[in-house]
Amino acid sequence: ASDVYKRQETDFVAKNEIFQTFVQQIADQALASSLVGGKDGEDVEALLGENGLKEELVDKTATIGEKLSFRRFEKVTGDVVVDYLHGNGRIGVIVAGNGASDDAAKEALKNVAMQIAAMNPQYISRADISADAMAKLKEITVDSALNAPDTLPKPILNKLIAKAVDGVWSAEDVAIYEEKKSNMNFLFNFLSKEAKAQLAELAMADKDAIVADKIFSGLVEGRISKQVKEISLLDQVYVKAEDGKQTVAKYLESVNKDLKIVKFVRFEVGEGMEKKNEDFAAEVAKQMNV
């Protein structure tokens, strides 16, 4: 199966028969080609060079009267391949699995495709996350924690506050601290924005020492683990889980222990463009009757 992301400027064009026919032509060529594509636009120019597609793209742009661009495509193969379109084609998902191809496997992969549409995982499993990606995730998590000092472990926070009180905070914020320090849970409700920003600056300045702290390290690892569960498909909680805990991996295992997902592709209208944040998860879950 092949999935193609084609961009146009208006919804009117998306419903245009000429446009739709051309998109199908690209999809057919992608399927026939030896090129495999990729999520970052790999092989797009090479595919456009096949069978006159580049010239067709120019011609269709002139005919329709709007700029058309072909951004990416991906090919998916497996013992069983299922697709799912959500929201009149706003989101498209293709999932490929190996190890089983009966009706139960197809139904399971269809459910997983709906899960992918709703929850937008980035990887099949945590094993697919590269060392570089994990390092970047850790860096972001560390900086996020340091820039939210109210969430830091108390021993670290207390050291930062001691520095802030000693000549960094304004007299007003120092007075607030002295008044509220007996109940630190409410301190940040009263501190000024400047005082909070100054604490974050102190934390970033002392980053190396804080990162070396075992308590902080545990906090970061916990947050990373939570994020990995959100971006790894098999680690996500299955949206139809009756107990609210069953993971996608456990769901597939309950259907057929040999059924394995080998690839999935998720395309969404407007990817790479500014768009409103919409609760697709709730919408898809409703369709799944959960």
Predicted regions and their residues:
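N-terminal assembly/interaction segments in proteins that build large macromolecular machines
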Residues: 2-3, 7-290
